[in-house]
Amino acid sequence: MIYVGIDIAKLNHFASAISSDGEELIKPFKFTNDNDGFQLLISKLDPLDKDSLIIGLESTAHYGDNLVRYLVAKNYKVCVLNPIKTSTMRKNNIRKTKTDKVDTYIICKTLMVQESLRFVTFYDLDLMDLKALGRFRQKTIKQRTRLKIQLTSYVDEIFPELQYFFKSGLHQKSVYALLKEAPTPEAIASMHMTHLAHLLKVNSHGRFDKEMAQQLRVLAQKSVGASDSSLSIQITHTIQQIELLDSQLERVEAEMTEIMKFNDSVIMTIPGIGYINGGMILGEIGDIHRFSSPNKLLAYAGLDPSVYQSGNFQAKKTRMSKRGSKVLRYTFVNAAHNVVKNNATFKAYYDAKMTEGWTHYNALGHCAGKLVRIIWKMMTDNLEFNLD
């Protein structure tokens, strides 16, 4: 076998290759993190037997992602190593030097001593996409939530009576359409009744009729809100930002849905798990074989119980540790909530925890833990959901 070690950095990478006998086949060389650099790497590898090549690199941030995709697309065997493994090899090295060139040899030697290697597949690349999309989705939702809070505060100042008029709240299409065109009570009060009624009816799919439009105009005429032009500008701009984020979320979720449909994961057989929750779970877990037991997956998600013990005392009720992936933990709890609503066994388990005196969120945490164990088994053995 021929082992290729690549030390990853932001702008430039280093690579070298040695045979299974330890013979240096490619001396350490630098190549850029772009198409020219990737082609230089391939030109160095071309003289070697491709079927004998195993390429290894450390899992470090996102700087190596494009290179991994490039190599997998060209059908090279690529292994992403845990930095802990290369660190152990580095400590065992007689020379404690750490340079980019030395690190390429360390990666090669780490590949050589592994009992088994798992190579990156196209499915793994899809998981990388799901993880990136899922995290971007979470970040976008947080941004949108902050904007909605800001918008509520602006409307409270300029038209405080409005949020009580719309029973479903301010954050709906019909209210946004109204406020973009007439962000102040004065503007609403001066609108022609036919136009106001039409605007509300069209954007609420017929839920708001002419009578509601009349009531709204009377409310606007009597409003005690502040007449502030700066607030009206902030309202219209904030709504535009929210709508932009809404459109971005639609695109992200559509892409996640396409990836999930293509891969047809067994976790989609769980009642209550949709393409988005399922995609976020798969993306955050990655390779399920990284976790030798469901307990390790629980710990990775931070859903394992924290233990409090002092002398002969041990707490009977403990909280989840919350030390793992925050995104994965949130997704599991959210997914558990949906599964409880769609599966009798999970509903009974949830009810039992509530009967024991746990709060709603504590009970959901227990359900999430149960869901983790089931998903670990399903993904490990490729089994469809069946609690019967």
Question: What do the PLM-derived regions correspond to, one by one?
Answer:
Residues 1-388:
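A detector of single, family-specific signature residues
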